[in-house]
C-alpha cells in the first residue's frame, strides 16, 4: 500500500484544485484523485463576487483569470418582460475593496487556469480516472481505496480533503448526513449565442416573474450567454427540449424565433439547500459542494467554495507545517458551516424566492426595496458589502457597521 506523508484531495473541480494549489505552494505533498478523465468541460458556476476575486488574487490566479473572464461592473434586476427594476453598481464598493466588480467565467476555464499553475508544482500529483470506492481511518492515517483503468489500489495519507461534489462519495463513506431540502422546481441551464446587449441587458441579470423567472449572464467574450430558468420537475429531458423555443420566445428580449439564436448546451437539473452535519470527521475534512449545496441564485455556491478551499488549506498548513493543534480544523469546520447556514443558504433562498414570487402585493414590496437600493448609493453599498460575510472570520466588521 502506498503511503503519502501529506494530503489526499478527492475531487478535481475548482475547489479541490485550489486546495491542492495552496497546499502545494506551502511545500506539502498532495495527491488529487478525480474520477473523470480530465477537467470537466461543463461551465456550471460562472459568477465570482468581490470577496472571491480577492481570494483568487491571494491564490496568485486573478491576473490569469481576468484575462479570460468577462468583467461585470454592474448587474440588473428585471421584470419578465425585460423592464428594468434596478441596477446595482459594483463601483459603490471602490473605497471598501480593491475588487469592486464581479467576474464571469465558466468554472471549467477557472479549473484550467488552476491546473496550469499546479503543473509547476512537483509535489502535487493529479490522478485522473481514479474513483474512490472506500474510505477508512485510524488515529494516524486515512486510507482510500480507488478503482481506475489500471485496477484497484489503496493509498493512505495523513489527511483527506473531500471536495468531490454534492454527491460526495467520501461524505457518504464516513457516515455524514447531508440534511436539507430539494426544491420542487427543476432548473434548466442553457448556454446560448444571442446578443442580449442589443436589448440593453447588463452582463448579469436577475429576472423577476412568477413563471418566466431567469438568470441571464454573459459567459465569455465570444457572445455566449447563460440563461437559467425553471421547469416543472415532472417533465422529461425530451419535453424540456421540445418546450425550449416556446420558453425562449418569452424569456429572451425581442421574442426571437429559433433561427435567431443558437443553443450550445442545455442541462436540466435539480437544486438543493443542504449541509453536512459537520465538515470534519477525524482525518477527513469537507469543502465546497461536498460540504454544502445551494441553489445558484446569486452566484454564492462556488464563491463560497473558493473561500472554503482557502480556509481549509490554511488550516491544514497550520497543522502540518506549523504544529498547530488539530482543533484548528474544527474551527474551520465550525466557521465555514456557520457561513453557509447563516449567510449563504438564507441569502440564496431569499434570492430564489424573490425571483419566482407570485403574490402581487409582495412583488410590489420587493420592487420598491430593489428600486431604493438601486437609487440610494448608501443603501446599495450596504446591500453589496453584505457579501463580505462569505469570508466568515475574515469579515471586516467595521466596514459592515459603517455601511
UniProtKB/Swiss-Prot annotation:
Q: What's a Pfam family this protein contains?
A: FAD_binding_3
Top enzyme category? oxidoreductase
Q: Name one GO molecular function term.
A: 4-nitrophenol 4-monooxygenase activity
Positions contributing to FAD binding: 6-35, 279-289
Q: In which pathway does it act?
A: Xenobiotic degradation; 4-nitrophenol degradation
- Quote the InterPro entries the UniProt record gives: FAD-bd (IPR002938), FAD/NAD-bd_sf (IPR036188), PheA/TfdB_FAD_monoxygenase (IPR050631)
Q: What PANTHER family does the entry give?
A: 3-(3-HYDROXY-PHENYL)PROPIONATE/3-HYDROXYCINNAMIC ACID HYDROXYLASE (PTHR43476), FAD-BINDING MONOOXYGENASE (PTHR43476:SF3)
Subunit field text: Monomer.
- Protein name (record): Para-nitrophenol 4-monooxygenase
Task: List the source organism.
Answer: Pseudomonas sp. (strain WBC-3)
Q: Which gene encodes it?
A: pnpA
Amino acid at each position: 500500500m502506498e503511503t503519502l506523508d501529506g494530503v489526499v484531495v478527492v475531487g478535481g473541480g475548482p475547489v479541490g484544485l485550489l486546495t491542492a494549489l495552496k497546499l502545494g505552494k506551502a511545500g506539502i505533498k498532495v495527491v488529487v484523485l478525480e474520477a473523470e478523465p480530465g477537467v470537466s468541460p461543463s461551465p456550471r458556476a460562472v459568477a465570482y463576487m468581490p470577496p472571491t476575486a480577492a481570494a483568487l488574487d491571494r491564490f496568485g490566479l486573478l491576473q490569469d483569470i481576468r484575462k479570460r473572464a468577462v468583467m461585470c461592473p454592474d448587474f440588473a434586476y428585471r421584470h419578465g418582460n425585460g423592464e428594468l427594476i434596478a441596477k446595482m453598481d459594483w463601483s459603490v464598493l471602490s473605497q471598501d475593496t480593491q475588487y469592486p466588480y464581479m467576474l464571469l467565467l465558466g468554472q471549467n476555464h477557472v479549473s484550467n487556469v488552476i491546473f496550469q499553475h499546479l503543473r509547476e508544482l512537483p509535489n502535487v500529483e493529479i490522478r485522473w480516472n481514479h474513483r474512490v470506492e472506500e474510505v477508512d481511518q485510524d488515529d494516524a492515517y486515512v486510507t482510500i481505496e480507488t478503482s481506475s483503468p489500471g485496477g484497484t489500489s489503496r493509498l493512505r495519507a495523513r489527511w483527506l480533503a473531500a471536495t468531490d461534489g454534492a454527491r460526495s462519495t467520501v461524505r457518504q463513506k464516513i457516515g455524514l448526513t447531508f440534511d436539507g431540502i430539494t426544491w420542487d422546481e427543476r432548473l434548466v441551464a442553457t448556454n446560448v449565442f444571442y446578443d442580449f446587449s442589443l436589448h440593453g441587458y447588463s452582463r448579469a441579470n436577475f429576472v423577476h416573474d412568477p413563471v418566466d423567472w431567469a438568470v441571464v449572464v454573459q459567459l465569455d467574450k465570444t457572445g455566449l450567454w447563460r440563461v437559467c430558468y425553471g421547469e416543472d420537475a415532472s417533465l422529461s429531458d425530451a419535453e424540456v427540449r421540445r418546450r425550449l423555443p416556446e420558453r425562449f420566445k418569452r424569456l429572451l428580449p425581442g421574442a426571437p424565433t429559433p433561427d435567431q439564436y443558437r443553443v450550445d448546451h442545455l442541462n436540466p437539473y435539480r437544486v438543493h439547500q443542504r449541509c453536512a452535519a459537520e465538515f470534519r470527521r477525524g482525518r477527513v475534512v469537507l469543502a465546497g459542494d461536498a460540504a454544502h449545496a445551494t441553489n445558484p441564485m446569486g452566484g454564492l455556491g462556488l464563491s463560497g467554495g473558493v473561500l472554503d478551499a482557502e480556509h481549509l488549506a490554511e488550516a491544514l498548513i497550520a497543522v502540518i507545517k506549523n504544529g498547530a493543534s488539530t482543533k484548528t480544523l474544527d474551527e474551520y469546520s465550525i466557521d465555514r458551516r456557520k457561513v453557509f447556514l447563516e449567510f449563504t443558504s438564507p441569502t440564496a433562498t431569499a434570492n430564489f424566492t424573490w425571483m419566482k414570487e407570485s403574490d402581487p402585493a409582495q412583488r410590489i414590496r420587493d420592487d420598491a426595496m430593489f428600486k431604493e437600493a438601486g437609487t440610494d448609493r448608501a443603501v446599495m453599498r450596504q446591500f453589496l458589502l453584505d457579501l463580505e460575510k462569505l469570508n466568515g472570520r475574515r469579515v471586516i466588521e467595521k466596514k459592515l457597521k459603517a455601511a
